[in-house]
Amino acid sequence: MKINIPENAKKVINQLNNSAFEAYAVGGCVRNAMMGIEPHDWDICTSAKPDEMERVFKDYETHDFGLKHGTLTVMSGGEAFEVTTYRIDGAYSDNRHPEQVTFTDDLTLDLSRRDFTCNAMAYNDKDGVIDPFGGAEDIKKGILRCVGDPDKRFNEDALRILRGLRFASTCGFDIEKSTAQSIHKNAALLNNIAYERIRSELTGLLRGEAVCKILTEFRNVIAVFIPEIKPTFDFPQHTKHHVYDVWQHIVHSIDSVEQNDILRMTMLLHDLGKPQACTTDKNGCNHFKGHQQISAELAEKILKRLRFPNEFSETCLKLILWHDERCSGSKKQIKRLLNNIGEENTRLLFKVQRADTAAQSEYLRAEKFASIDLAERQTEEILAENQCFNLKSLEVNGSDIKALGVKEGRAIGELLNKLLDDVIEERVPNDKGALLRLAQKYISK
């Protein structure tokens, strides 16, 4: 198979080859190229030792911050390429990093330390694909398989557990039986991994086309670092609005929303409070009053634990809190929604509600979708016509109220909000004169 290596990467490989060293593109770039995906990064492995690499690239701009592990960053044509000496990893005491590395001249030994067969391939134009572990065949069959002993691979670096789930989710691969068994067996090792790294892999996993399958088959793995999901497993909903238990509803809702990180994380967390909120009536029907607030409280802890950025978390929490707010064709409700969560979040909320509805039963589904469509159209009308829905669009401001003799800041704010409420409820037009007259009446009372 011919892989088109970019000229800047080829230049680095040729520089090593011309100096009598082996050099290959390796790992994810080879995998992606074989799958027809444009690689973002081209990593290079070589038989040259670190000091030899420095000599080979003495006329290049280089960065040596990874040199003790055998990695030299080489600048070629304005691009950075990581060039790493073939190596064998020593013992892993922290389930993340080897205590030491030993350099080798053997490419196969270097490839043998890698995580999955699809990532254990190398390529250059002269030798073609070097594939000692059958990675190309596994890619062709859509199989994710560890290189060698899965238990050993996951004990070396526990993050590989989540990385494997991400690959399976994004590439649609089936996880080979012994690899899958080892993932379940070693899931607790994820407790040794930094939450920032877990966050990155989880986000990628949620973005995948096969997310529904992975979250169903490997839910206990996710529960290692998000134990709050456990109560939703197999928790029945017993209502005509639902056909799935709570966890399966969550999973199908993720699969039903676009591949946007905020939206997919929101769907993962939006109903976690249902088991706590559940009550059962005399007819055996479950109700989940207040589950939005409980879900948001649980979500806040999870997002903080996984070190999500504040802005990302705030958006998720607003969407979770308001995900069951149905506007029922009322522009007044929509204006209150816009005032509470803002324009962009309101648009996102409708996407959340569509995904939520898609993961429910067929009972009134068409009517629910129609209601969301109507609310969306009315929202755009309100925005296009610059209708008043917040203090910013109110025709009076704090200075106007202060001029009427109200001096205390809190009282000014309360009066402005009262006027806004009157405008939204259409008791008074959004006209400065009318609002000032009404404000004067409130002050005089």
Model-derived regions, located:
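Catalytic cores of the polymerase beta-like nucleotidyltransferase superfamily
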Residues: M1-K445
